[in-house]
Amino acid sequence: TGYSICYELGIFKQKIVDGQQVELPDNWLGLGDAWLIPKMDEVEEVRFGGTVEDDWDSQGRHQIKHTGYDTVLAVPRDMEIAGYKTEHGNTLRLWDAKSPTPVDMSLFSSGQYLKAVEQKAMAESISKVLYPEDNHYEGKSLRLKQQYFFVSATIQSIVRKHRAEYGTLRNFHLKHVIQINDTHPTLAIPELMRILLDEEGYSWDEAWYITTHTIAYTNHTVMAEALERWPQQLIERWLPRIWQILKEISGRYQDALTTYFHGDLSKVAPMAIIWGGEVRMANLCVCACFKVNGVSALHSEILKKDVFHDAYVRTPDKFTNVTNGIDHRRWLAESNPKLDALIQECCGKDKYLLKPEALKELEKFQDDAGVLTRLGEIKAANKKAFAAWVQRESGIVLNTDAMFDVQVKRLHEYKRQLLNVLHIIYLYQKLKADPHFDFTPRTYLFGAKAAPGYAVAKRIIRLINSVADMIAKDPICKDRLQVVFLENYRVSLAEKLMPASELSEQISTAGKEASGTGNMKFMMNGAVTIGTLDGANVEMHQVLGDENIFLFGLKAHEVAEMKEKGYKSYEYYVHNPELRAVVDQLNVGFGDGVTYEDIARRLLFGDGGMADEYLLLADFESYRDAHVRAGLAYRDPKRWNKMALMNIARSGIFAADRSIRDYARDIWNVPVRTIK
């Protein structure tokens, strides 16, 4: 069973106005919720605020009195999900936040209508919006409430069902694994402890044993700012009993660390759970979970060697890797029916749908001119279909004769959409200087949402649109260079775009991307990757070889070494005249009255931090050279189609089926039934 919150609204619907992102409500439930079945007999109560008093009964047993709290009801809404040709289905349980009191009748009767429904509004705000902005106190409070609401309802539900079946929780850890997906559900740890201690009467040691043999943690990021830290005052205010338990866990863990590291605070402090008035959720996971896994081989090594190094030294058996995977039945068979038909013809009907490793059978067609030609025809047809959709939606006419060069993902500096833009500016400048400049025509497609409070990311979106407008207005670029920002990037758009894509931009700074799954979706649909050795790109390269991927840039250890020695982006600017011209163009602007001195300054001098933190200028020349190689390969359709076919053939290892088998074998310790 999977658990989450039944959000009414998604993160936001993106609108581009004058080149800038504007956030509008994205009404998820308004699309219809007929498949969500409310289970009113399984409603859970979640408590916020109030005060906690310690008490002891006549036999000296510790008891907790929690008073003055606010109650929010968690209403489960279940979606049943059928498997493909299996005898089983799974349940996705989404919790809907409701107030136990729809209206305060005494206030309503006295004419205080807004005040009368305030409690209802506050309760329902918990399941209102996915990822509310949290750069202010109210936003942080709401995020914390969302996380505790979600885990408290979930843990209570699991415990209730287990108790009904077995009559005891002593075997709880033998019947359940609770997989924490990133740090957002980390409060499941103290919540399970709370139930075992306060409601079931277990001793601390008994409760801790059950908890630490039940919960496992998947880490999804090495970015320090994404490893959640909560102000302790916030937890004290809204979750007083959870705070008490966290303090006890933290104190015991810190004592154990102090003993293990012989009082070395330089080791203890970074691993502490509560330190400097903050509660560090990732450290809590590493302390309490029986397994910690990264989501690509490189990512898991970085966790062991850097992010959680001392924890790894202390408990090496706790750490493992499970590389991410994607649902090939959705992202290939359903999204790309023409390609699915060709694969079924070559590999034996729907064999690959049950066994994605069967895609490897395509390799025997790598020199089959007929199959390669058909593969090229399918890609061309998908490009035309996508272009027709874009024209209907936006009025923009895509050049389908050019290579579709695609970068679609969350807008973040480490993902380096800006590096892509700098290269586009370079191409434009070369075209302006020499209209006969020889390069392979490109249609660049971007799709990205920036977090509402992430100012730099929003500026990069505006920059992309400024460059796109300049190129669209310049006749010299006609049929040679085009840039389009696809508004409101989302799953339904991705399902149309992936089958039409030809070059997949996976260009994050090496060592920063945990895994990525977009890279796998592109690969499975026959797009060739241009990328760094980062995240799952490393494993893609291992199965593809140098000949089927365009690699560039510094490796993760080289990035670390360069930063340690003192990276000076300005030297690259000074010594490379073409790069200098590109950066200088940011200061001048792109003909729409908007300049980007702030971005140029950030690259050359920093903006209160390190200049060019993600090493765009260091990787620029290597990136440009990789694009030249990609362009030359694209001009040879037979070679390109062979590369595309090899990408599809070797993508089976990145199917979610393999990923789930790895979790089942290495973490959950459950048998996997082989489908014949």
Predicted regions and their residues:
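A conserved ligand/cofactor-binding region detector
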Residues: 1-676
